């Protein structure tokens, strides 16, 4: 007859259905939570990239107002901020097209346009060199975006070249001749296709983290000449000793 059967079997079926529904809800809840966490990290990275671009725009305005001191200070802050953005993006492994485009535009604005304006546009030679610097920055960014380099950068990264110019501007009080010489040297390093290691300072050796934290502390709590000398030494050590100093101890993720 219908409706007859083992009651234990019926109850076990009900329990299995309940467990299945609970498991489905738990999996769905965990999936939503992971998506929200990933979305929040994307927002943080995008906000930092936007802040980087705003600093670059302020640096441009300061250069037009002939306040190279403030313009250089903005670029040094952007240099430290860019390292944090790059480390977070690589460490979290968050592919985000809009975020990448925003960060690329921020890099071009800050470390391309704003850095080139430190040279000044008063004379034809300065203006021509500033244009060459911007074009070199664009070429280097396009080459890296399409080159597919995984073990490191090809050509000197733009933030380090910008850090050298900003530090030199602070130490020389905006000496145009010295800045033009340094900019010419940075252009050669950027178009040279030598390999430079990824600057995952915050995900590497402890001494590299100390170098980064020291830069942050000096930038906000010490006189500018000392900060500029510190950042200049940091950048030049990366330029001239990329593998011996900065290429060791980087954690290779599986």
Curated annotation (Swiss-Prot):
Compartments (UniProt record): Membrane
Keyword Cell membrane: no
GO CC, any one term: membrane
UniProt superkingdom: Eukaryota
Alphabetical keyword list: Membrane, Transmembrane, Transmembrane helix
Membrane topology: Multi-pass membrane protein
Transmembrane segments: 44-64, 69-89, 113-135, 171-191, 210-230
Name of the protein in its database record: Transmembrane protein 269
Organism (species): Mus musculus (Mouse)
Gene that specifies this protein: Tmem269
